[in-house]
Each structure stands twice: as structure tokens, then as C-alpha cells.
Amino acid sequence: MSLTRLLIKDFRNIENADLALSPGFNFLVGANGSGKTSVLEAIYTLGHGRAFRSLQPGRVIRHEQEAFVLHGRLQSEERETSIGLTKDKQGDSKVRIDGTDGHKIAELAHLMPMQLITPEGFTLLNGGPKYRRAFLDWGCFHNEAGFFTAWSNLKRLLKQRNAALRQVSRYEQLRPWDKELIPLAEQISTWRAEYSSAIAQDMADTCQQFLPEFSLTFSFQRGWEKETDYADVLERSFERDRMLTYTAHGPHKADFRIRADGAPVEDTLSRGQLKLLMCALRLAQGEFLTRESGRRCLYLIDDFASELDDARRGLLASRLKATQSQVFVSAISAEHVIDMSDENSKMFTVEKGKITD
């Protein structure tokens, strides 16, 4: 599925934009601060309900406006789908699909699977475990129909359990929460483990092409001891959890560890190599989705040229073209992306929030 039309109103520095898009490569060229990243962020927000540079809605709404409006048309082989998102300064959202309101943001995420590659995306590799959990959970969300509901219920129960830890004196008082929490935790951990195992070879093959000088390994850590029943862990950890006032073990503490030649990648790779690894992981994940479900990702790449030499840019471009997916690329200069262009590409110039093609 590709995004054939994008309408943006009062988002960042963009007052109004109506873009007819290519199903292949779309290039956004402009100086720093021109608004080219804002276009990528508008697409991301349309599919996620939130921006990738700010979690506060007021910061992405254009100055002195009350809300932003995003609208898109998605085209698949079978049909066209109309989608829309409005969000005000209080964070209240309205999702519209095919002309009807009342839809959930998760429905937009399902319709628009996308991979984001930005200069800030290094957190996948050198940030905390939550970023790598999010990487796995993206795959589980798009591969397991029940994942989102289970994950949402897990978050709710953990919040309730942590609140209860401040009030209880005996473990038996927590059993009502743990009775619901334990099967959810085990199911989510099983899905994550299965997904990480299924995609491991895809990641290894892609990483070998991008970083042949390293031997990369991947390991899933579920968030509590191996070969240990989660129910036993919760009961055994009760006094410590009560003292900390939060649940110290569980799927919310899981990690997906990535090593190069046996050492953590953040201690071994240069910034350029980290960017290559990030690109390889995002590509592998998108290609795995296509192979398993027949659905293609949208790829959003901000500041394409940074950290990469000509050869590596060429490799990334050729791999992206091979996916036959829709790709959005921002760059300061057209010279950085002209080699990627073909007869099906579109080049947009962005200047002070105005977009022309």
C-alpha cells in the first residue's frame, strides 16, 4: 500500500500543503529549518498519532492555531482508503477512515506500517532497552493479531499493580492482579521470542551486506530469569517490589541485545557504522513483513546523506529500490539524492514551510 495523496494543515511550520506522491521515491530537498523533516513527521504522525520529534501536541501545531489536520489517501492493489487525523493542543485526537469517525490510532498504524530512519534513531542501538522493545513490538504488532490488546492490558495491569504495591502488606493482596498479569506476560514474551527468532537470519544477512567487517549476534532477554516461572518470580520479589513501589521483573524489562564481535555495538561501532546497522535492521524488518504478509512498509529517511559515504548511500538506495516500497527521503541538496532518482520519482523543494514540485 502506498500513500498517493497527502494534505497537511497547521503542522509545524506548514500552513497548507497538498502533495501528489509517487509510489516509489519521493525526495524532499531544502535547507535546515525549511520544513522538509516536518513533511516526514506529518506522514509519521498520520500513521502513529504522535510526532517523532516531540510528544507534546502543542509543539507540532502551527503557531497560534488550535489543531493540526492531516489527511491521506492510501492505494493498494485492491482498493483506495481515505484516512485522516486531527489533534488539538490538549492532545485530543479524532481519527477518520473512509469518511467515518470513531476509529483508533492503532487502526492507522495497521494500515500504514512504516520504518523511520533519522539522526535521532541511534537510540535503537545506544539508548535504553525500551527502544529495542519497541523494535520487537512493532514486529509483533504487525504479525500477531492479538498483540496490541494484550500489550495494552499488560500496561494497564502493571500500572494498577504498582499502585497497589504502595498499599498492601502481604503478597496475597496482590494475587488478583497477578492472576491476570501472569498469562499476559508469558504470552507477550512468547510472541517476542518467536519474532526475534524468526527475523534473526534476515537481520544477520542484511547486516552482513552493510557491515561485512563485523560478526553480529542478536539475543532476546525476556525480563526475568531463564527457566523460571513468572508466578514464582513475582511472589519471590514481593518485598523488594514493595520497597521499590514498582514491579522489577517482567516483559516491561525485556531487552533485545545486539553485539558486534562479542561486544555491545555502542562500544564498538563508529557513528557511521551505527547508522548502517540501524538502516540494516529497519530494512530487514520491513522485508520480513513483506515476505510474511505481502504488505510493504513506507520508509521515512531524514537527512539521508549524514554519516554515510557515497558507496554506503548507493548500497542503501539499491536495497530500498529492491523492496519496491514507497520511500520518502529528505536531504539538504538534490546532489545527495539525484543518483537515486528515476522516471517514477518525485522531487519536492521545501522552503519556509512551502512545498513545490
Swiss-Prot record:
Pfam families: SMC_N. GO terms for cellular component: cytoplasm. The keyword Metal-binding does not apply. ATP binds at G30, A31, N32, G33, S34, G35, K36, T37. Coiled coil: none annotated. Gene3D superfamilies: P-loop containing nucleotide triphosphate hydrolases, RecF/RecN/SMC, N-terminal domain. Keywords: ATP-binding, Cytoplasm, DNA damage, DNA repair, DNA replication, DNA-binding, Nucleotide-binding, SOS response. This is DNA replication and repair protein RecF. It comes from Salmonella typhimurium (strain LT2 / SGSC1412 / ATCC 700720). The lineage of its organism: Bacteria, Pseudomonadati, Pseudomonadota, Gammaproteobacteria, Enterobacterales.
